[in-house]
Regions:
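Class I SAM-dependent methyltransferase SAM/SAH-binding core
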Residues: 1-46
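A short, conserved alpha-helix within the catalytic core of class I
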Residues: 65-78, 92
């Protein structure tokens, strides 16, 4: 269900990306919206921003960068930025383009074919961690694998 204009204006949205060009591109779509903020920053150092906590955290394709300590950053986001009872949506890339053809899975070192164990390891870690914190966790998707977690009440 889509939010109406007043509902949208009552919610604070913050987007964070390491890429300055991605931030500038995103800002163009939300120029008139005072409740939407975009920040160019390294997510390894989120604590520098003093963001506080949020009811919903969405991270799509950002935690799988090679310069990120996945487990530590994920746990920090959960512990420091998700409200008690909040929800998370995490998107894990499950495909890449090679010569105009979509290939599923990731290219792993020393393999001549796509391999899923790295992304499945990350998804399993998040799922197990959140289930231990009493979240209902569902994994869906195809091109991206989405982990959706809601607190069990």
């Amino acid at each position: 269900e889509m939010l109406d204009g007043e509902e949208f204006k009552s919610i604070e949205f913050i987007g964070i990306d390491y890429s300055a060009s991605a931030i500038e591109y995103a800002k163009k779509d939300f120029l008139a919206d005072k409740n939407v903020e975009f920040i160019c920053h390294d997510i390894n150092e989120l604590e520098d921003l003093n963001l506080g906590k949020f009811d919903l955290i969405i991270s799509i394709g950002t935690l799988q960068s090679s310069n990120i300590n996945f487990n530590a950053v994920f746990m920090s986001i959960y512990q420091n930025h998700l409200e008690s009872g909040g929800a998370m949506i995490l998107g894990f890339p499950n495909c890449r383009w090679i010569d105009s053809e979509m290939v599923y899975g990731a290219k792993a070192p020393n393999y001549s074919f796509s391999e899923l164990s790295l992304v499945l390891k990350d998804i399993h870690f998040c799922k197990k961690y959140l289930q231990q914190k009493k979240y209902r966790v569902v994994v869906t998707g195809k091109d991206y694998l989405f982990l959706t977690a809601r607190k069990i009440v």
